């Protein structure tokens, strides 16, 4: 299992971890309603299992902007946000990007919910 899962109630806001351009907004068999945002420098963030999506391919988004709501679409056993980071198309340890340079955006704000361990993490892009 790649990425991080953030348990949250259906309808909980999902916000962009950093500014960028929406490069994918589609339904995927495993990920359900999925969004991918290109942040430049070959860095993509992926948000999966959304119940509602508020952006489309080509949209510019800002850090902290509401892009979707938590859901349980696709291959999912309960409402949560599945968050991934890809560099040059290769999945990375998403945890490393939650504390890498820049200003803090608490991961709780990305999912607006508790982290899997119940501890708050920071997204620093």
Q: Where in this protein do the model-derived segments appear?
A:
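Catalytic cores of peptidoglycan-degrading enzymes
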Residues: 1-125
């Amino acid at each position: 299992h790649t990425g991080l899962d953030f348990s949250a109630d259906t309808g909980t806001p999902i916000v962009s971890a950093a500014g960028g351009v929406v490069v994918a907004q589609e339904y995927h068999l495993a990920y359900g309603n999925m969004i991918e945002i290109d942040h430049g420098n070959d860095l993509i963030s992926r948000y999966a299992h959304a119940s509602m999506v508020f952006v489309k391919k080509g949209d510019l988004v800002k850090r902290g902007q509401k892009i979707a709501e938590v859901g349980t679409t696709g291959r999912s056993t309960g409402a949560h946000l599945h968050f991934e980071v890809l560099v040059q198309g290769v999945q990375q340890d998403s945890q490393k990007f939650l504390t890498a340079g820049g200003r803090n955006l608490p991961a709780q704000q990305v999912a607006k919910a508790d982290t899997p361990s119940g501890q708050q993490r920071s997204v620093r892009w």
